[in-house]
Structures are given as C-alpha cells and as structure tokens.
C-alpha cells in the first residue's frame, strides 16, 4: 500500500485541484502522458454540501458517497479513469472519510444533510454512527483530536463496524472504477487502528485497468506533524505512506534564504523527515498555499518556488506531488465558475500555459522539465555533491543527470557532472526540440566536467541536464 503503482518510466502525482473529470481525461492524453507524469490526485468525487458562494472547502463536507459533483457524474468519472489509465496515468481519489458536513443543507446530487440531527439519509448515517459532539481544541490530547469534531464537522465513528463497512464499500467502488489509490484526508483525526482495519478491507486494484495481479491501492495520509503534538506521523506508516508536511516547510525556508543551501547535503530523514519509502512529498498543497504561513512557497513567489520544486524532483527522496492551482486572491475563493456555479474548464494557450483562472504549475516548463529529469535518473543516487559552502550547490544523479542551484551570487564553476561526454540541453531554460536546445546548452568533456554558469539575476536559479536531453 506504499507503491504508487505508476506505469513504468513515470513519476510524480499532480494535484489537478477542482478540475472536471472530462478535463482531467483530456489532460492525461494531451499533456501528462507525453511529459511522463505518473498520476493525478483528483478532488473528492463524492457528493458534498452546496455552500453559499461555492468555496473550495465545500468539497470537504461530504453528504453521501454518490459520485456526482461539480466535476461530473459516475459515467464521466469512469471515462476519466479509463482514458487516463490507457495513457499510463493513474488516478488517486481524495477520500474524505473522517467526517460529514458542518452545517445543514443539500448536496451536489440533491441529497439532504441534517447536521443538527446527525442524519444523512443518502448513506444512510444516523446519530449512532458519530462520535458525541465535542470540539477538537487540544492537540496535546490524541483522543480529543480523533474523537471530537474538527471545525464543527460531524465526526464519524470509524470504530463502528457499520461505518467501517460503508467506508470500505465506497473505497472499493472507486477501485472497481479503476483508481490506483487514495489520499486520505484528515487521517490525523482518525485512529490508526481503525484505518488499518479499513485499508485491509480494500480490494486489490482492478486488472481491467492495466494493474498487475495483486496490486494494492496506494495509500497516502494527511497527517500534519510539525512536532510538539500528541500524535506522530510515525503512527500511520504501518499501513500506508504519509504526507510529509515538514518537507515543504524546510525547503521553503531554505529557498527563501532562511537556511543555506549547503545544508541540504544530507536532505532526508536526518532532517526529521520520514523514511523516503514512507513519504509523499510536496512544496505546497491546496491548504497551506492559503494558510500555511510565510515559510510555504507557492506560485505567488515563482522564482524560489520553481527552485524548490526542481530540488524536490532532482532529489531521490520520497514520492513527489506537484500542486496545480487555480488563481485566488481570497482564501475561501472557489474554482473558476460561471454564474450558475458550473465549473469552467481551463483554457490551454499556445505556449502550454493555462487561462480561465487556472495557474497550471504542472505546465510550467521548469516543472515538467524536471519531471522528465526525474524519469531519466530513476534508480540512481546523489553523487558529485558540490557547494560553495553557502547558497550554491550542485549534484549529479549517478551518471544520468546533473543539477545546479544558486540562491545567492553568480555561479561560474567547472564542475564534475558525472555525465558522459557530449552536449546537453538545460531543461529549465528550454528543452530539446527538433535536435537542438531551445534554451541553454552545457558541454560535458571526456572527464565528465563542464563549465556551469548561472547568474543570480536570471529568471531561474537552477540548471538541469540529463541523458534524455542530449544532442
């Protein structure tokens, strides 16, 4: 349950936040497949509360497990999983299984949500299926965090056989429809013992969608653990991966100048991070790009953000996830939508970028170029580490790829790239296209060394070359 089930030669999950199923299917075929992406994390596919103003967070208030949302119905969902899997791109469901709604109302499929009466007839859940109401207000008390209500959301009792059965059935239905795994929302707010039982009840992946016999769903759990609380991320690694929140905090701090890049030489568990095989890593996500504090880098701070993403994708640690946002000015703001609340599809520009209010970080050349880099260096380790003892670093991945960063001053060095002799295209400033480089090129000599130059005033403080972008 720690294997992402990527097709061969692919890596990275991109979170297509609030996209419609038919747009995701198109994106799998037209962009994610040719660029080597491994999979897509989708927004919650089950019925959720229709909230005033249609904020993004309404999707995290379930009303039922009917597959009918602003992103599409079950037939659109199945069309997406079929087309994406055919393209070698996996689908991971954002599974909201800790709670139901925080208010009364109606869901996206027309079902009623009786928050006050603890009654969700479309499931059905009644008052006996929830923990007694109390407020999550003490992160030094694990029982409070797990058995009370997070911001007023009715808290399901996963210790109940009935509730477990409903959740297992929902997740197994998703497996039947061809998904490769689940991001588990609010896992910290559920008991590891209960989650272990639920995940052990999941079917193997559906071989009709190209998965191997006996393949298990990939599980990666939201456990925000920045230290100092009663609950540890390590409680959840026995039955799945965990989203490593410390990763983005530490990288964001470094690339904003709060820590010298030379200190990244031992990046990984020595920094207090999970073991690599247990970790799904990211620079920002849909929550902390809004409320994560100044250390979290986002698309709004593009130069250091792209450098942090490049470091994440260049380094072997963890299973990587990339955020693909819609532009927002207000933290509650929902996705691009028309006057009736219908989602608007992203527009695709000639230069690969998006319009209609979508940021599409995954379509930035500096990002997809590094996904290609990660595929090219699969199976290698960090070698030829160099630093100027400050904010300039470089390293190779075996003899397959080489990357250099400056976060202070111009970098002009003759460095050992570890690569075979030849001329390579920098995949940050451009790419290999039609037999030539559209950006910078780097010539590696017979001894593996090359003159590397990276000016501090350039658009990007990173340069990357690999064997699949060689002239």
From Swiss-Prot:
GO MF entries: alpha-amylase activity; calcium ion binding; chloride ion binding
An individual GO BP term: carbohydrate catabolic process
Keyword Hydrolase found: yes
Disulfide pattern: 28-84, 134-148, 354-360, 425-437
Region of interest called Disordered, as start-end residue ranges on this chain: 326-346
Family: Belongs to the glycosyl hydrolase 13 family.
Quaternary structure and interacting proteins, as annotated: Monomer.
Protein name (Swiss-Prot/TrEMBL): Alpha-amylase
Organism whose genome encodes this protein: Tenebrio molitor (Yellow mealworm beetle)
